[in-house]
């Protein structure tokens, strides 16, 4: 799945909550959104610093802030990745993330994907 498709699935889970998935769907949404971040960051880093492709995500996120021409957006993406990573881990003493938090992180990821995804090549 592409990063955009992953975000679409995450948004779909938010929109179609039901009793059967209560308590589980927020972490599923966070996982899908985090996968979208990781795929888009890896793609961006690979285009700008190919030697970093196989490094851990934390290293790629550090490189992202240095390579991006939109440092504020890069910092927001790094924060979103950390928040989404925390949200994917279950701890009995923690509440799942709220819908507004998830939507905010998803919006940040979507903005980043739009900013860094190259335009498709069209044939004439």
Model-derived features: positions:
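Short, mixed-charge, low-aromatic patches
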Residues: 15-20, 35-41, 58-67
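Charged alpha-helical initiation segments
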Residues: 1-24, 78, 117-124
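Amphipathic, well-ordered alpha-helical segments in soluble domains
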Residues: 6-9, 13, 32, 39, ...
């Amino acid at each position: 799945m592409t990063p955009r498709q992953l975000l679409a699935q995450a948004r779909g889970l938010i929109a179609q909550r039901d009793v059967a998935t209560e308590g589980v769907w927020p972490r599923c949404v966070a996982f899908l959104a985090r996968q979208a971040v990781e795929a888009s960051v890896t793609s961006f880093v690979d285009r700008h610093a190919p030697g970093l492709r196989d490094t851990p995500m934390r290293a790629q996120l550090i490189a992202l802030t240095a390579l991006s021409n939109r440092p504020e957006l890069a910092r927001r993406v790094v924060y979103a990745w950390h928040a989404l990573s925390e949200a994917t881990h279950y701890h009995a003493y923690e509440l799942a993330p709220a819908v507004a938090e998830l939507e905010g992180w998803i919006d940040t990821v979507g903005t980043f994907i739009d900013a860094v995804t190259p335009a498709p090549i069209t044939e004439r």
